[in-house]
Regions:
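Short, basic/aromatic-enriched C-terminal tail that caps enzymatic domains
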Residues: 172-199
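Solvent-exposed, flexible loop/coil residues
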Residues: 28, 64, 74, 124-127, ...
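Rossmann-fold dinucleotide-binding core
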Residues: 1-79
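Helical "substrate-binding/catalytic lid" subdomain
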Residues: 70-176
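Generic hydrophobic, helix-prone segments enriched in Leu/Val/Ile
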Residues: 37-39, 99-103, 183-190
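Metal- and O2-centered redox machinery and metal/ROS homeostasis
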Residues: 6, 10, 144-147, 199
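Alpha-helix boundary/capping residues
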Residues: 12, 53-54, 108-112, 157, ...
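Short, basic, helix/turn surface patches
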Residues: 44-55, 129-131, 175-182
Length: 199
């Protein structure tokens, strides 16, 4: 959150060092679309030396917090949508309508279904760290008068995934042949275990 970045800036600058706020968006360098490193603060152009063909550096006005803010807004949409997709899939499974939902998505929103199949099965690998990111997003929006509840809920979904049997995987070790149905079954088992523990 921008407020978190400003708190860190105070600590670092009090110690006598310079602080430049940064937020990176995109996959690691070497992929089709280069990542974008957003920077802001005191003379952020100093980090333009990091620019290269496979990484773009973009400076922002607005001081410390601006780079963090754009990262929060982008992740709110991108990763927030991942949790909504997971919520819908697990919810449909719990309601006994997984096949019916899949058929409806295939008919009405085939691109949405394809996107879900391409990412939901492996979300558990990053869920633990992304949960904290959702809470930072919630704080970002609360600080400007918007509801934090959407992304507090997103954090809860990532917590559920982090409790699942798939969470021991990393991006490198994740089973890439896993189907969306297998992932939803694992997430549903995590949900059932929580219910038993709460009983």
């Amino acid at each position: 959150a921008p407020a978190t970045s400003r708190t860190i800036a105070d600590i670092i600058e009090t110690a006598g060092a310079d602080y430049i706020d940064g937020g990176i968006i995109g996959m690691p360098p070497g992929r089709k679309n280069p990542p974008r490193l957003y920077v802001s603060g005191d003379r952020p152009e100093r980090l333009e030396v990091l620019a290269r063909p496979d990484m773009i550096v973009r400076t922002l006005d607005g001081g410390v917090g601006a780079a963090s803010a754009i990262k929060m807004c982008y992740a709110a949409l991108n990763k927030g949508a991942m949790t909504l997709e997971t919520l819908v899939l697990v919810g449909a499974a719990q309601l006994g309508l997984a096949s019916e939902l899949r058929r409806e998505l295939a008919d009405a929103q085939p691109q949405t279904l394809e996107r879900m199949e391409g990412r939901v099965p492996w979300l558990a690998a990053d869920a633990e760290r992304w949960s904290g990111e959702m809470l930072e997003i919630a704080r970002t929006f609360a600080d400007v008068g918007l509801t934090p509840l959407i992304h507090e809920g997103a954090a809860e979904i990532f917590d559920l995934l982090a409790d699942s049997s798939l969470a021991s995987e990393t991006r490198e070790t994740a089973n890439r042949s896993r189907t969306i149905e297998e992932a939803v079954a694992a997430f549903s088992a995590s949900l059932s275990a929580r219910a038993r523990d709460a009983a």
